[in-house]
Each structure stands twice: as structure tokens, then as C-alpha cells.
Swiss-Prot record:
Keywords: Cell inner membrane, Cell membrane, Membrane, Transferase, Transmembrane, Transmembrane helix. Pathway: Protein modification; lipoprotein biosynthesis (diacylglyceryl transfer). The keyword Protein transport does not apply. Belongs to the Lgt family. GO terms for molecular function: phosphatidylglycerol-prolipoprotein diacylglyceryl transferase activity. The gene is lgt. Pfam families: LGT. The keyword Cell membrane applies. GO terms for cellular component: plasma membrane. A 1,2-diacyl-sn-glycero-3-phospho-(1'-sn-glycerol) binds at R154. This is Phosphatidylglycerol--prolipoprotein diacylglyceryl transferase. It comes from Brucella abortus (strain 2308). It is found in: Cell inner membrane. InterPro entries: Lgt (IPR001640). Its EC number is 2.5.1.145.
Length: 281
């Protein structure tokens, strides 16, 4: 029984300070650094893709690499605003409707990846249309590098001892400082592996091996599908948000509900890209 686990059967939580360093009243956290690293990597990697003309249809990238320099600010706003608004709407609406002044308090935590995706998607659409860029290719350019940022942020979640997994007796279960007396799945690291390393590798093969950037929308569809499937899988090991709990049957979570449409949308995007390529062949 899990309730009779001995302390030796699980791992102690590593003593890592969530704050990397302080400069006066300013504290730099691993979580914030994760977002910065994610945005900067997607910017750098996107420029690398745009400089590789052979990856694109007719050897013609959809935009100049320098265009991404301007998009960085748009992306940051999309991630932060979308992530926060998504968390408020999807995960703790009753609290924030009663405490609206707490909504801007990002330093207290509370970001939704699904909301961040919606915010960034809106930013990409507006930016692409303002510059005359094909929207689907804009999606592809950014999506190809996003998994690395996801992986870093999930590691930061682990360091912060948040979003931990369900109680478990697996040998690698961890005693989280604020996770109660029983060991739990380090589900943040599962997500870092699947949403970060594995998904980046899959997209890397699609981009550099299968040359799927020549089919606008395919890489973005693969990213959305891959993330959705990864998130659904990890949700079986992740503790549901305390303020929501299980939505049905002791297994269905909000993360699953929000991920299913992503999988369907991603599959449709890949089908659409293949169909368009077949028509133009």
C-alpha cells in the first residue's frame, strides 16, 4: 500500500533555491528564466530555419530572418497575457472574479500553457498579417523551437516544487516539500521529457529530414498534436489542480479536456497541409 511506504523507498527533494540570484529587491527565479530561455531559443532557432532556404517551398522562406527580431516582443506579450488570462478563466475563475486585483499578480504564480498558446497564436496571426507573411508558415517557424522552452519551464516547475504528480510507490517517486507526507510522481520531469526533448526531436526530424516546412502548417500541426498527446498522457500521473479536482470519474482533468481539441486541431492542420501539397504537386 502506498500509505505504508517507508521514507527510503522514495527520493528526497533536491535542495535547489527557486531564486537564482537577487539584485536588491529584484529576485530572478528559475521559472521566469525558463520563459526567457524559451522565447530566445525559439527566436534563434526560427532565424536559423529562415536562413536555410532549402527547407522551404521553392527555396523561398516566408519572411526575412530579421522579422523575428520584431516578433520577440509580440511573442512575450502573447505568452504572458495569454498564459495569465487562460489560468484565470480555466483554472481559478471563481477566485479571481472575487479578487480581480489579484489577476495582475504574476509573481504569485498561475500560468496556463493552453492560454499561452492561444495568446501566442493571436500574436502570430496579427504580426503575420501586418507584415504580409503567410500565417501557416509563421506558425511553423515558431512552433519548431517551442518544445525546448516547454522543457525548461517544466524543469523550473520541478525546482519550484509545484504541479507535482499523484502519490506513487515507484522507486523514483519524490517527497515534495509542499506535497504532503507521501512521495509523488515527478510529473514535471515527465512533461519536460515528452513535451520538451521528445517533441523537439520529432519536429527536428520533420523539419530537417522530411522537409515538412515545404507544406505550410504541417509542423505546427505536429507540434499541437504532439503536445496534446503528451499532456494527456502525463495527466494520468499529475495531481489535478486542487481548486478543480477531477471533472469526471476520478480520472478526467481540466488539462485533458483542454488538450483534446489541440490534438484534433493539430491532426486537421496536418491533413490540410498534406492535401494542399497533393493538389499543388
Amino acid at each position: 500500500m502506498i500509505e505504508t511506504l517507508l521514507p527510503a523507498s522514495a527520493l528526497a527533494f533536491p535542495a535547489i533555491d527557486p531564486v537564482i540570484f537577487r539584485v536588491g529587491p529584484l529576485a530572478v527565479h528559475w521559472y521566469g528564466l525558463g520563459y526567457v530561455v524559451g522565447i530566445l531559443f525559439a527566436w534563434w532557432y526560427g532565424k536559423k530555419l529562415l536562413r536555410s532556404h532549402r527547407l522551404w517551398a521553392n527555396n523561398q522562406p516566408p519572411m526575412a530572418p530579421e522579422a523575428l527580431d520584431d516578433f520577440v516582443i509580440w511573442a512575450a506579450l502573447g505568452v504572458v497575457l495569454g498564459g495569465r488570462i487562460g489560468y484565470v478563466l480555466f483554472y481559478n475563475f471563481s477566485y479571481y472574479i472575487s479578487n480581480p486585483l489579484a489577476i495582475p499578480a504574476l509573481w504569485d504564480g498561475g500560468m496556463s500553457f493552453h492560454g499561452g498558446i492561444l495568446g501566442t497564436t493571436l500574436a502570430m496571426i496579427l504580426f503575420a498579417r501586418s507584415r504580409g507573411i503567410l500565417v501557416w508558415s509563421m506558425f511553423d517557424t515558431i512552433a519548431a523551437g517551442v518544445p525546448i522552452g516547454l522543457g525548461v519551464v517544466r524543469v523550473a516547475n520541478f525546482i519550484n516544487s509545484e504541479l507535482w504528480g499523484r502519490v506513487s510507490d515507484v522507486p523514483w517517486a519524490v517527497y515534495f516539500p509542499n506535497g504532503g507526507p507521501l512521495p509523488r510522481h515527478p510529473s514535471q520531469l515527465y512533461e519536460a521529457f515528452l513535451e520538451g526533448l521528445v517533441l523537439f526531436f520529432v519536429l527536428f526530424v520533420l523539419v530537417w529530414g522530411a522537409r515538412k516546412l515545404k507544406q505550410p502548417g504541417f509542423v505546427a500541426g505536429a507540434f499541437v498534436t504532439g503536445y496534446g498527446l503528451s499532456r494527456i498522457a502525463v495527466e494520468f500521473f499529475r495531481e489535478p489542480d486542487a481548486q478543480i479536482g477531477y471533472l469526471f470519474g476520478g480520472w478526467l482533468t481540466m488539462g485533458m479536456v483542454l488538450s483534446v481539441p489541440m490534438v484534433l486541431l493539430g491532426l486537421w492542420a496536418m491533413w490540410r497541409a498534406n492535401r494542399a501539397a497533393a493538389r499543388n504537386a
